[in-house]
Amino acid sequence: MDSPSPNSDPLTIGGRQFNSRLFTGTGKYPSMTSMQQSIERSGCDMVTVAVRRVQTVAAGHEGLMEAIDWQRIWMLPNTAGCTNAEEAVRVARLGRELAKLAGQEDNTFVKLEVIPDARHLLPDPIGTLNAAEQLVKEGFTVLPYINADPLLAKRLEEVGCATVMPLGSPIGSGQGLNNAANIGLIIENAGVPVVVDAGIGVPSEAAQALEMGADAVLVNSAIALAGDPAAMASAMSQAVMAGRTAHLSGRLPRRDQASASSPTTGLVQSPQ
């Protein structure tokens, strides 16, 4: 089997194709230049943007809309900062208008985040489901950020979400895939793409997610807070491609006992 290249193995979400299975963010970078270089080195073609921070011109987000080539990069507006379903729906609508200002008139994507707890940043399952139902009715392409809950993931798929985005571990924690077993169940049962979002700290964890069968990963903090963000972005890109190739290749089955690599017949016998 030939190794897939990004162009020969696209990911489709909401009818749109993406060549890269690594999505990135725009927060926490030391500078706008660092963000631009990291996006370029990552090879990604979808970047998430916090609508509220852009709307209020929060620190670190000045000039963000002008800093990214929106003819090449697909915008994924997100509802970060929303604590309930009603807020999230309102901010999603603003995000759609923001995408239009970037020249993406047909962009209906939204990364849905409903997070009432500012300390642990864990998503509210009930608020997320309620907001998702409303946004789907309004024609949005909904990518919901959720705990690694297989039942919730299936319910969100049933109401019309374009993906599910289970967390590996809490946002920005760098703890990796603490919920690997549940993520595996989500992948096994999903009829929509599964994008692992949050907690990935190093490229090996991004590769692990793709090896398991996840369709993509979204990585922000691990890149933005690295000693060399652009180099880390490149490493993440390579890891994602390696993980995807490994998944398609099929891993060696696990065994309870050793299995010799060399044949056991025709061995040279030592003289008696």
Curated annotation (Swiss-Prot):
Per the UniProt record, one Pfam family is ThiG
- Keyword Transferase tagged: yes
- Source species, domain of life: Bacteria
Q: Which family does it belong to?
A: Belongs to the ThiG family.
List its EC numbers: 2.8.1.10
* Active-site residue numbers: K111 (schiff-base intermediate with dxp)
For region Disordered, the annotated ranges are 249-272
**Descriptive protein name:** Thiazole synthase
Name the GO terms of the biological process aspect.
Answer: thiamine diphosphate biosynthetic process
Q: How does it assemble?
A: Homotetramer. Forms heterodimers with either ThiH or ThiS.
Q: Mind telling me which InterPro entries this protein's record contains?
A: Aldolase_TIM, Thiazole_synthase_ThiG, ThiG
Q: Where is the composition biased (Polar residues)?
A: 258-272
In its keyword annotation, does this UniProt entry include Transmembrane helix?
no
The organism named in the record is Synechococcus sp. (strain CC9605)
Which reaction(s) are listed as its catalytic activity?
Answer: [ThiS sulfur-carrier protein]-C-terminal-Gly-aminoethanethioate + 2-iminoacetate + 1-deoxy-D-xylulose 5-phosphate = [ThiS sulfur-carrier protein]-C-terminal Gly-Gly + 2-[(2R,5Z)-2-carboxy-4-methylthiazol-5(2H)-ylidene]ethyl phosphate + 2 H2O + H(+)
Role according to the record: Catalyzes the rearrangement of 1-deoxy-D-xylulose 5-phosphate (DXP) to produce the thiazole phosphate moiety of thiamine. Sulfur is provided by the thiocarboxylate moiety of the carrier protein ThiS. In vitro, sulfur can be provided by H(2)S.
Q: Where does 1-deoxy-D-xylulose 5-phosphate bind?
A: G172, A198, G199, N220, S221
GO terms, molecular function: thiazole synthase activity
